[in-house]
Amino acid sequence: MKLEIPFDEEGIFLERKTRFTGIVSVGKERTQAHIHNTGRLPLLSPGKRVLLKRAKSERRKTKWDLLAVEYREEFVFVHSGYHSLVAERILGEMFPGARIEREKTSGNSVLDFLVDGKTFVEVKGCTFEENGVAMFPDAPTVRGKRHVEELIRCVESGFRALLLILVFLESRCFLPNRKVDPFFSEIFWHALSKGVDVCVFRLKYDGEYLHSMGNLPICEEV
């Protein structure tokens, strides 16, 4: 999978003004950038280089969208608005020729995809790691737990269910973040035992393209 998402300008991150608004420096200008991500994003700290995309509408309060932030030796893609497009491309490779439908209702939840009317898919993006282990979530997620519970119900109803995790930074394996959200961690392992499939994909952003770097294993629980 290779998806073109070029950035327009490089800047310096100054501060997170609100959950979805950051202050950045672009050249000599101090301006606002939209942070399209509901996580805490601990890697987004003052002084970090960031890659920005110009907002399509001139009427918007924030002039820029924040695409990626410098972390160690790479730029980590943090714009969750692209997750569905990335996942759709990956699913197209996993299920060649399949009918892929977005946002399908199952029970009281809306899951991200339904493949060929048989496989429900929920997508989660991961931008946090600790000691080389990618972890989700980086903040408690009641909604994420509910989605995994619905995937379990899908399996119990005769469907196939897939939790697709997109990891955007260098890691050797993946674990649910028990320290941050023990309830999500518990339901994650329960889902595996109930037959929910989990696929973890590592993605790398080079400023022009988002590349799929292959699968990551699930670590032994620590």
From Swiss-Prot:
Which residues does UniProt assign to the signal peptide? none
Q: Which InterPro entries does the entry mention?
A: SfsA, SfsA_C, SfsA_N
Recorded superkingdom: Bacteria
Q: Which GO-annotated molecular functions does the record name?
A: DNA binding
Q: Which segments does the entry list as coiled coil?
A: none
Q: Which Pfam families match?
A: SfsA, SfsA_N
Q: Which family does it belong to?
A: Belongs to the SfsA family.
- Listed name of the protein: Sugar fermentation stimulation protein homolog
Q: Which organism is it from?
A: Thermotoga neapolitana (strain ATCC 49049 / DSM 4359 / NBRC 107923 / NS-E)
Q: What broad taxonomic lineage does this protein's source fall under?
A: Bacteria, Thermotogati, Thermotogota, Thermotogae, Thermotogales
